[in-house]
Amino acid sequence: MRNHVAVLALALSASSLCGCAKKIDATFEGTITMTTTLAGKAPQPMMMEIKNGRMRFDTLGEGGAPMHGVYDPTRNEVMVFMDSQKAYMTLDFSRATAPAPNTSAETSIAEKAGGKDEVAGISCEKWVSKETSGKRSEVCVIEGVNFFDLTRLRAGAAGLGGVGPQSMQEKKMFPLRSVEYDASGAEISRMEVTAVDKKAVDESRFVTPADYKKLEIPPAPAQP
């Protein structure tokens, strides 16, 4: 079960949001196509659908099994669906027991890199985050859009410091591109939006199928 969440987390490495007319805001409704690439592995496409601030992420799990996740910012929760198993899990990030970010202000620092760039025709602002370990992340973000990144569940994932997943969620800073580097400067992972389509999205895309079984997430082991 943990592997299923990890697979989706990797696919959502730095999920992005952009809009038609070279602009994006909280009212955007439509689909976004992006590609995530992990070092040594083939690029993996992912489709995201947005409606009323909610986000649905469709990707492939282990063995190519279909999976999707739905993030509801009003509840601060993510529902992870294993479609081939007709099962789902609910991750409530408003609870004190929710998984914590992988980095902290004590081990990383984030700052504006200066300047802007354009991703999929959308203007974004450059930020960089550096960790005391030597790792760094470069992101290009837009502001004012809901964000959630499941990489905060992935053990050992490089964080974004002051513009990390939790901080970005709170500040509504959404990355259109994210690139991770290790201490030697080698690229670890990359996510980038490739296409945007502004259109109506059916409400049923965010509804839990009636025949899906809810799975309970086992409690995390006690820390020594």
Regions flagged by a language model, labelled:
Residues A21-P224:
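Extended soluble regions of mature proteins
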Residues M1-V7:
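Bacterial N-terminal signal peptides that target proteins for export
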Residues S16-G19:
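C-terminal motif of bacterial Sec signal peptides marking the signal peptidase cleavage site
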